[in-house]
Amino acid sequence: MARKMLVDGEIDKVAADEANATHYDFDLFVIGAGSGGVRAARFSANHGAKVGICELPFHPISSEEIGGVGGTCVIRGCVPKKILVYGATYGGELEDAKNYGWEINEKVDFTWKKLLQKKTDEILRLNNIYKRLLANAAVKLYEGEGRVVGPNEVEVRQIDGTKISYTAKHILIATGSRAQKPNIPGHELAITSDEALSLEEFPKRAIVLGGGYIAVEFASIWRGMGATVDLFFRKELPLRGFDDEMRALVARNLEGRGVNLHPQTSLTQLTKTDQGIKVISSHGEEFVADVVLFATGRSPNTKRLNLEAVGVELDQAGAVKVDEYSRTNIPSIWAVGDATNRINLTPVALMEATCFANTAFGGKPTKAEYSNVACAVFCIPPLAVVGLSEEEAVEQATGDILVFTSGFNPMKNTISGRQEKTLMKLIVDEKSDKVIGASMCGPDAAEIMQGIAIALKCGATKAQFDSTVGIHPSSAEEFVTMRSVTRRIAHKPKPKTNL
């Protein structure tokens, strides 16, 4: 009996060793070479993993068959949009320059096609940089559409239509998200943000449907370049989810720069006419535009991945369900970025990808951490926030909340004559004195807020803000000179219920 037990034990050990020694083509195969996918591939390779990655062929406008290394952010998102924001800002700067002694004696023309070409040149440069980063990390790049065909197997359909399968110990889904259009009659006449970044002709009349950051940013961009812009959104104010006081200021700034706002209004029909695209609003009004942009949300780009067929759980929106380590219910399959629909920001995808690489290959299991994630809306002027809004703080409060605000006319505007105030705000938990939220709407808001985000991440108190010496003269110094409480919000315990 003892002999049999020993033999059985040896057999079990050999079987386990053989299972661990299973040969795979790759330690990791990544589907999607956007920000998260490239980061995960590179960092995993740096940990010693053999890595493959696939991505669709490059094109500025994405579809089910075209994409490009770099993903949405680099090719048709954050980067090209910010380039257009810079371009749009110069119009106002030229106006502001007059009171600073600059005389523009000749007519100044804006050439859309020149800016568009410079934008395309830049995203191609970045596309090539991302490819080099992968090559330098010894990551094998395959051009084609990837799909999962088993817990440890992916299939890549190449440009010529041929299909090749690869096995991998781990598979990472990093396919991002895709812009969606509401099912309004005539919706095929509208464009999404993809096309908006690559229009051949500049739209002199633009209609934007949506109240989120993409809608607000494009309204600012086109208006800054001289277009007539009408912005339609369902709520009373744009930018739902942001601090209400900041939302109101953004709305005033948009109107102050000439954007026509249509709150609590949607579109019911689009029709092609000789004069342009005719639009009918939910209030029965008619408008005509050269371009209609639908900026009404994005959805996880997972439909063609075959995930449900191999047992990977998705939520109702099609997002990949993952745990705190970005692992799906199938132990060998993971997901990061917009495909998981957690916080859909490029830096968050990078953070999740880093945590994944540490967990899967670095011997250091690391949970993705989402507290105090800063973000910005690149309208003109921009809005930036970190931590809790006033409304969120009140909702989550266990004690009294202190609100500090500072609204002022920036020094630059006092000379230029521009009537546009900057607003800065701190939210403080009175009991602990910790700063739990910060927001700013005004020039350079995003640049300033990155430093504030570090302070909040480190648990800074209001007393520490107050003891910090400011940089003078600057707008940023207001964050360390707000001494007087604007308002105190008393904590109201939620009523107990037996239901």
UniProtKB/Swiss-Prot annotation:
Its main location: cytoplasm. GO terms for biological process: cell redox homeostasis; glutathione metabolic process. Binds 1 FAD per subunit. Its cofactor is FAD. Disulfide bonds join 73-78. The active site is at 472 (proton acceptor). Gene3D superfamilies: 3.30.390.30, FAD/NAD(P)-binding domain. It catalyses: 2 glutathione + NADP(+) = glutathione disulfide + NADPH + H(+). Its EC number is 1.8.1.7. Homodimer. Catalyzes the reduction of glutathione disulfide (GSSG) to reduced glutathione (GSH). Constitutes the major mechanism to maintain a high GSH:GSSG ratio in the cytosol. Belongs to the class-I pyridine nucleotide-disulfide oxidoreductase family. This is Glutathione reductase, cytosolic. It comes from Arabidopsis thaliana.
